[in-house]
Structures are given as structure tokens and as C-alpha cells.
Design a protein with these regions (language model features):
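The two-metal-ion catalytic cores of nucleic-acid processing enzymes
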Residues: 1-306
Length: 306
């Protein structure tokens, strides 16, 4: 069965990503012609929610529909019916029946970045420190893709990979690391991206760092539609800034755990190491002998990548 993974609006176009009946990925820019309903005096087979006679009006574009609604805004004797959320209208028109989503087709990418932080805590707003590694794993692949700046031998990996493999991309500098990552990403756009606190750290840090190093053109390549939207949210009195990579859904594991992991109760810490132990009985690979992650990076790059 066909289904969608993302539907966005850009001007008079619908930006559609999904899968067809054969499980083939679809990326389509569609000129959508919405419908609204206006009152009529004559008897009509079409009725409003309140039983009023209405007629269907199809517009050439979403912009035309918006202009029409604006003309009658505040007119008590001429009420326009139908949804002006044209994304919802598009989805309803395309999928009039229940949608069967096939999880086996959906490409979910788990990713994580590491940042050099030898003289302070890196903040995504400033993105002042270099990105020194990026790792990702697609649900459609058994291979971890890792970009780093030092030597790494996957055959010496200390972590139980449970049959998965590691493809390591050694880079000579941060600029090369970001360029190679963007090159891979733009050829393998996922449907969903996830990580631990990825919405308010990994993604905004990466967006802002790429903007500093390479410019807006390369930032836009993070989206299959070459569009990045800023999203602000106030959490515990503090404004957090995230970015929507248009065409890719975000499912932050930290947010999901706080929302759906209530059976574990309140936690003393929401760091990944602690939650991993609470849920799975496993901690992250220990590097306490090095004191800090930055010292580990400097002294044992092999274990740092692990």
C-alpha cells in the first residue's frame, strides 16, 4: 500500500515524500488545487456541517484560495466552509481511506555528532567548536557510517556490533569531514532522523557549524527540498532553537522517552548513559581512565570512535 512520510507546503506546491504500492520511494512537487465550499440559495446535494446548502469551488492554486477566503473574512452573511489547512486537505484527497504505513520501507536514521570541547561546553547556538566525528546507522542497512579525523581500525572495535559492520571515512580536517558527510547524506536522505537530544543539540549544532564553515548553500543540502526552517520552543523557561529539515521527520529519543517512558518513573538524570542502564542494563563504553571525552579523543582515537 502507498503511504506518505512527509507532506510540506512551499508556495503553491505540495512537497510530497512517501512510497508507492510497490514500496518505491517517491519525491514529488505537486501543484495542488484546493477546494472550498460557499453558501448558495438553491437546494444543493452538498451541505455544510450545520445543514446549509453549499457549492464546491475549486481553485487553481492555494494562493488563489487564500485570497478568496481573505475577501470574505468577517462577512457574517457569507461563510466559507472547508479546511484552509491545505496540507490536511491534500492528504485527505490522496488517501480517502485508512493509510497502512509499512515500517519495513521507512528509512529511519539514528545519528550522533561529537564536538571538540577542550575549553568549554559546546552550544548549538554558537557552534564555536569543530565537529570531530559523525556517526549514523540506517534502519535499511547493517552498516554504520562513521566520519572522523584520526586513525580507526574497525577490526579492533571493543563494542558488540551484533552482526553490524562499520564503514569508517577518515578525513584530514573538519572541512573535509563535513563535505564528505553532506555528500553521503544528500544521496541517501532518510525519512526519519533520530538521536538522543538530536532536536536541540546534534541537528542545530550541525546546521550552525556547516553555516559557519561552508555557507547556507551547504546547510540547505541537509533537506531533500533544500529548505531549512527555524523552530523555537520554550522548555522550562528557556527558549530552545531547533531546525526542521524539510522533508525529513524528527523523532528525538530523549523527547520520546520523557513522553512515553513514564513506566520507568522520574529519573535522576536524562543523560543517555543513565537511561541506557535503566532501560537496557547497559552503560555507554566507559572512558573514565581518560577523565573526559576530549582527553579520550586526544589519547585513544580508536576507543573514542567506538
Amino acid at each position: 500500500m502507498a503511504f506518505y512520510t512527509s507532506v510540506n507546503r512551499y508556495g503553491n506546491s505540495i512537497l510530497y515524500r512517501g512510497y508507492n504500492d510497490n514500496g518505491v520511494a517517491i519525491n514529488d512537487r505537486i501543484k495542488f488545487k484546493p477546494k472550498l465550499y460557499a453558501p448558495v440559495d438553491a437546494d444543493s446535494p452538498l451541505k455544510s456541517f450545520f445543514g446549509q446548502n453549499v457549492k464546491e469551488i475549486q481553485f487553481d492554486s492555494m494562493g488563489d484560495a487564500k485570497e478568496y477566503v481573505g475577501m470574505y473574512d468577517g462577512a457574517d452573511n457569507y461563510q466559507i466552509h472547508g479546511t484552509t489547512n491545505y496540507i490536511h486537505q491534500f492528504i485527505t484527497d490522496k488517501f480517502p481511506k485508512d493509510i497502512s504505513f509499512n515500517i519495513n520501507h521507512i528509512n529511519v536514521v539514528n545519528f550522533d555528532i561529537e564536538v571538540a570541547s577542550d575549553d568549554g561546553f559546546p552550544t548549538p547556538e554558537a557552534a564555536a567548536y569543530p565537529v570531530i566525528s559523525i556517526a549514523l546507522k540506517s534502519s535499511q542497512s547493517s552498516v554504520y557510517q562513521v566520519w572522523g579525523l584520526g586513525e580507526y581500525d574497525h577490526e579492533k572495535c571493543e563494542v558488540d556490533m551484533r552482526g553490524d559492520l562499520i564503514q569508517y571515512h577518515k578525513c584530514s580536517c573538519e572541512e573535509e569531514l563535513l563535505a564528505k558527510f553532506i555528500g553521503y547524506w544528500s544521496k541517501n536522505y532518510p525519512d526519519v532522523i533520530t538521536g538522543w537530544n538530536s532536536r536541540f543539540f546534534d541537528i542545530p549544532y550541525l546546521v550552525n557549524r556547516i553555516r559557519i564553515i561552508a555557507g547556507e548553500e551547504y546547510v540547505n543540502k541537509l533537506s531533500p527540498w533544500k529548505q531549512i526552517n527555524t523552530r523555537k520552543q520554550t522548555i522550562m523557561g528557556r527558549e530552545q532553537v531547533g531546525y526542521e529539515l524539510v522533508g525529513i521527520q524528527q523523532a528525538d529519543y530523549l523527547e520520546l522517552f520523557k513522553k512515553f517512558g513514564y513506566s520507568y518513573g522520574m529519573q535522576e538524570s536524562y543523560k543517555l548513559d543513565h537511561i541506557g542502564y535503566v532501560v537496557l542494563g547497559d552503560n555507554k563504553l566507559s572512558y573514565e581512565e581518560h577523565g573526559s571525552l576530549h582527553t579520550l579523543y586526544k589519547n585513544d582515537h580508536q576507543k573514542f570512535i567506538d
